[in-house]
Every structure is written in structure tokens, then in C-alpha cells.
Curated annotation (Swiss-Prot):
Listed GO biological process terms: response to host immune response
Span of the signal peptide: none
Name under which the protein is recorded: Uncharacterized PPE family protein PPE46
Organism (species): Mycobacterium tuberculosis (strain ATCC 25618 / H37Rv)
The family this protein is said to belong to: Belongs to the mycobacterial PPE family.
Biotechnology: Exhibits vaccine potential. Immunogenicity is demonstrated in BALB/c mice. Immunization with this protein induces a significant number of CD8+ T cells and a strong Th1-type response, with high gamma interferon (IFN-gamma) and low interleukin-4 responses, and activation of the bactericidal activity of macrophages. Identified T-cell epitopes may contribute to immunity against tuberculosis if included in a vaccine.
Additional observations: Was identified as a high-confidence drug target.
């Protein structure tokens, strides 16, 4: 890189360039723009910091909140750094503008240089017998001073602008918030799966269709002027109530009208066939792409739904006390008695409002529960007002689901179909109603 030699040019060049330049207005406008950008960056960073802090404090919970915070914390830091860089850039633009103003103030002006040249010309013109030798020397020395001053001012201005240019920070690119390449694979597969629109197939089908019906279309177009004239004559005959003329015109042109009608019907059929064929091609293309793309889009969606639903179902099972259901035995034994014995109640009758037997004795210790809780109900076991029979199958099995109140059910659960009118009098192993 070569640096300009300011001393090699006369001061008129430097003074003219500085005076005729755009001035410091553009630099000051750029500095104001950088200052506004710095303030905007700072405001956005502050607002986003509040949001990220709220999310991190627990407004959201789960992996999504963690990913949000992890993605936006670097972006907030970049906003803060960008605000500082913009403020620094504004300051450097102000420094460059100030350097320009100082250089313009220190630079010898064009009127001063012109006055020096005019004085030198007058002194030289009136230098009779060398009387102006000393003034001419002083004038030339003053011009040399302005020459050196102009070169010095330009060197200082170059140093100030170069330092401002070097000190101006360059803001790096913003960090990526959305994970790059997250959907590239699925998009590539979907793009490879989607077939292009069948323009060529449609054009080929239409060409074949028009070729098949071309003779009818040509005949229809050739007959159209004559048929139009015939219809005009018939219309005039109708308006003039010329029945005889109408019949004569219609009879003399019957063959033409018949051929025109036949050709028109063929063309209409061909047009409908072409429209139906194009619709069929487009529908087949749409359905084929749907069957190819929907599984690609539905797979990740169903996987996400399953991942979200399965933990929820497991949590509900834990709340309901079904986290550890006992396994059903491989083979069920003989049905065990639902109630071992029922002691008679005083008076022999229980109030109709009683819902359960008043006193129940547990089954003998030697009887084991061989049937565990099933997913099927007891079913219809009888009606109110009927007596139980030994030949009828009795309810078998106890509900032994464990919960925080105990390890098993101390009292057997009666079927829900038994109404509140049951009494507590035992009769041959059955329940008797009143």
C-alpha cells in the first residue's frame, strides 16, 4: 500500500480539494445513524434480557424452555456487543468529522494563496534596480510556509482518519437461533419424493385428443359461416311470420344443419373428454404426492405426540395407584366363595335403606384367592326379589389392588348390579330379599 506524498503537491491542490469536498455533513449524519442503531440494539437487548430471565426463572418449564434460554442468551450478548460497536463507530465518525473541520481551518485558503501570487507578481514587476529583492524573498518564503503547512495539515488529517478507520469495530454475524439443518434431511426427502407437475403428460394427452377430434372440429369451423347465415334467415322468417319461408329454408338446409349438429356433438364430447382427462391426471398427481409426503411429515409428528402422551399416561397411572398392577395368574382355580358366612341380624330383617350386609365374617384362612382383578365386570347376576341358587355361578375373586390404605381389600366388592333392597339373612349360601 502506497501513501500519498503530500509535500509533492502545491498547497492550491490540497486547499481546493478540502474546500470543494462534501464537507463534514455526511460524516456527522453517519455518526447520528450509528448512534440511533446503538440505542436500538440496547433497547432490544434489554427487552429480550427480561424475557429470557423470566423464562429462566420458571415461567416455562421443560426442554423447550431450556432450549429457548440456550438459544437466546448468546443472541442477547451479541445485541449488547453490537450496541457497543455501533456506539464506537459513531464516535469514530465524529472524530473523522472533527479532523476534517480542523484540517479545513488550518489549511491555507485559496484567497490567501492567490494574494501571495499577486503580491509576488507585483514585486517582480516593480523590482527596479533590485529594490524589491528582500520583499520578494519574504513573499516566496511565506509561500513555502503555506506549502509546508498544507502538507502538514493533510498528513495530520490522514493520520486522524486512518486511526478512526482502524479503531472502528466490525460487528460479527448474529448467532444462529434456529438450529441449522434441522429440517434439511426431511425437506430433501420430501423434495425427492414430490414429483414435478405433469405438464408434458397433459400436453401430450391434449394433442392426442385434439388429433382424434380434429376432423370434426375442422368441419364444424368450415360449416359455421353457412350455418350462421341459415339461422339468420330462419330468425328473419320468424320475425316476419313467414311460415312458408321458414319451412322452405329449414328443409333446403336440413342436411347442413344435421351435419353441423353431429360435428358439434362430437366436438363437445371431445372437449368433455379432454377436461376429464386433464382433471384425472392432476388428481393422480396430487394423490401420489400426498401418499409420498404425508408419511414423511406424519412420522416425526406422531413420534413427538407419542413421546408427549406416553409419559402423561404413565403419570396418570401413578396418580390412580395403578403403577404396579399385579399380573393375572396363568391358570385360574375353582371359583372361591364370595362370602364365607353371614351371621343373622337381630330381628331377621334389615332396613330397606341398607346397601350392604350388616355383618360379614371373613373367609376361612385355608381358602386362597386364586382369581385376581380382571378387566371385565361381573355381568348380570340376577334381579331383586329372587333367591340365589347353588347351580348358578357365584361371583369369584377378590379385588386385591394395593394402595396407601393397605395391601388388599379386607371386604369383598359386591357387583354393582345388586340393588339397595338386599337383606342380610343368610339362606344356603345365598342372599334373601324381603
Amino acid at each position: 500500500m502506497t501513501a500519498p506524498v503530500w509535500l509533492a503537491s502545491p498547497p492550491e491542490v490540497h486547499s481546493a480539494l478540502l474546500s470543494a469536498g462534501p464537507g463534514p455533513g455526511s460524516l456527522q449524519a453517519a455518526a447520528a445513524g450509528w448512534s440511533a442503531l446503538s440505542a436500538e440494539y440496547a433497547a432490544v437487548a434489554q427487552e429480550l434480557s427480561v424475557v429470557v430471565a423470566a423464562v429462566g426463572a420458571g415461567v416455562w418449564q421443560g426442554p423447550s424452555a431450556e432450549l429457548f434460554v440456550a438459544a437466546y442468551v448468546p443472541y442477547v450478548a451479541w445485541l449488547v456487543q453490537a450496541s457497543a460497536d455501533s456506539a464506537a463507530a459513531a464516535g469514530e465518525h465524529e472524530a473523522a468529522a472533527a479532523g476534517y473541520v480542523c484540517a479545513l481551518a488550518e489549511m491555507p485558503t485559496l484567497p490567501e494563496l492567490a494574494a501571495n501570487h499577486l503580491t509576488h507578481a507585483v514585486l517582480v514587476a516593480t523590482n527596479f534596480f533590485g529594490i524589491n529583492t528582500i520583499p520578494i524573498a519574504l513573499n516566496e518564503a511565506d509561500y513555502v510556509r503555506m506549502w509546508v503547512q498544507a502538507a502538514t495539515v493533510m498528513s495530520a488529517y490522514e493520520a486522524v482518519v486512518g486511526a478512526a478507520l482502524v479503531a472502528t469495530p466490525h460487528t460479527g454475524p448474529a448467532p444462529v437461533i434456529v438450529k441449522p439443518g434441522a429440517n434439511e434431511a426431511s425437506n430433501a426427502v420430501a423434495a425427492a419424493t414430490i414429483t414435478p407437475f405433469p405438464w408434458h403428460e397433459i400436453v401430450q394427452f391434449l394433442e392426442e385428443t385434439f388429433a382424434a377430434y380434429d376432423q370434426y372440429l375442422s368441419a364444424l369451423l368450415s360449416e359455421l359461416p353457412a350455418v350462421a347465415w341459415v339461422w339468420f334467415q330462419l330468425f328473419v322468417d320468424i320475425l316476419g311470420f313467414n311460415i312458408i319461408g321458414f319451412i322452405i329454408t329449414l328443409a333446403s338446409n336440413a342436411q347442413l344443419l344435421t351435419e353441423f349438429a353431429i360435428n358439434a356433438s362430437y366436438v363437445a364430447v371431445g372437449l368433455l373428454y379432454a377436461i376429464a382427462g386433464v382433471i384425472d391426471i392432476v388428481v393422480e398427481w396430487v394423490i401420489g404426492n400426498l401418499f409420498g409426503v404425508v408419511p414423511l411429515l406424519g412420522g416425526p409428528l406422531l413420534g413427538a405426540l407419542a413421546a408427549a402422551v406416553v409419559p402423561g399416561v404413565a403419570g396418570l397411572a401413578g396418580v390412580a395407584g395403578l403403577a404396579a398392577l399385579p399380573a393375572v395368574g396363568a391358570a385360574a382355580g375353582a371359583p372361591a366363595a364370595l362370602v364365607g358366612s353371614v351371621a343373622p341380624v337381630s330381628g331377621g330383617v334389615v332396613s330397606p335403606q341398607a346397601r350392604l350386609v350388616s355383618a360379614v365374617e371373613p373367609a376361612p384362612a385355608s381358602t386362597s384367592v386364586s382369581v385376581l382383578a380382571s378387566d371385565r365386570g361381573a355381568g348380570a347376576l340376577g334381579f331383586v326379589g329372587t333367591a340365589g341358587k347353588e347351580s348358578v355361578g357365584q361371583p369369584a375373586g377378590l379385588t386385591v389392588l394395593a394402595d396407601e390404605f393397605g395391601d388388599g381389600a379386607p371386604v369383598p366388592m359386591l357387583p354393582g348390579s345388586w340393588g339397595p333392597d338386599l337383606v342380610g339373612v343368610a339362606g344356603d349360601g345365598g342372599l334373601v330379599s324381603v
